[in-house]
């Protein structure tokens, strides 16, 4: 859980404006979204808030949190496949769509090609991403055989070239790829991603 003082600080810096779309890909109880709405004194469009979580109870609490703070129109979805927003993204109509792993004949969404869709649907890009995802060595992702194709949709998974990866790294790429051009992002991550040698690929990728 992110302390409210930190959330307040981050929202003040990012400073969401009217007509901007906002997402928390690991929404929890939607504190980032609710604080953004409250701080705007209701001037932000309540239809422009989006969130995803793997826990149905969290999504219920998030929806209630937004409602109690005056936003009854936020789009907050549960994706209880254990992957949440790692695999599921919003399309431009506000519906969840899944990444498509490569096949022998098609690259599909392999290695960050998330806009390469044969179904004609377009990935929704957001003006603002605010999130505090799971991260750290204890929260490493070790994809099973079924999920490996999804992992390969992430360029950083392929760059790291290991059998496991810090979830914070995956959620970092996830946040960047759903961010609109000239958008603003705030993500709470471990200091290690910004400093230690084993995460140099993440830093290099982010600066490219």
Outline where the language-model segments fall:
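Mobile active-site "lid"/loop adjacent to the S-adenosyl-L-methionine
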Residues: 134-167
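Short glycine-/acidic-enriched loop or helix-start segments at secondary-structure transitions
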Residues: 34, 140-141, 197
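A short beta-strand submotif of the Rossmann-like class I SAM-dependent methyltransferase core
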Residues: 131
């Amino acid at each position: 859980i992110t302390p409210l003082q930190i959330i307040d600080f981050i929202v003040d810096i990012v400073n969401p404006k009217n007509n901007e779309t906002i997402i928390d890909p690991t929404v929890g109880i939607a504190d980032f979204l609710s604080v953004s709405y409250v701080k705007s004194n209701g001037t932000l469009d309540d239809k422009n808030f989006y969130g995803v979580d793997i826990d149905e109870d969290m999504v219920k609490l998030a929806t209630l949190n937004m409602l109690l703070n005056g936003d009854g129109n936020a789009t907050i979805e549960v994706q209880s496949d254990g992957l949440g927003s790692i695999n599921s993204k919003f399309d431009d109509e506000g519906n969840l769509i899944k990444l498509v792993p490569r096949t022998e004949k098609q690259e599909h969404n392999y290695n960050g090609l998330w806009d390469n869709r044969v179904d004609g649907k377009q990935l929704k890009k957001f003006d603002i991403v605010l999130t505090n995802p799971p991260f750290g060595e204890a929260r490493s992702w070790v994809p099973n055989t079924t999920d490996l194709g999804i992992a390969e949709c992430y360029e950083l998974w392929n760059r790291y070239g290991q059998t496991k990866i810090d979830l914070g790294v995956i959620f970092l790429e996830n946040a960047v790829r759903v961010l609109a051009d000239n958008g603003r992002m705030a993500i709470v991550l471990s200091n290690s991603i910004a400093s230690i040698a084993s995460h140099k690929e993440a830093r290099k990728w982010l600066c490219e």
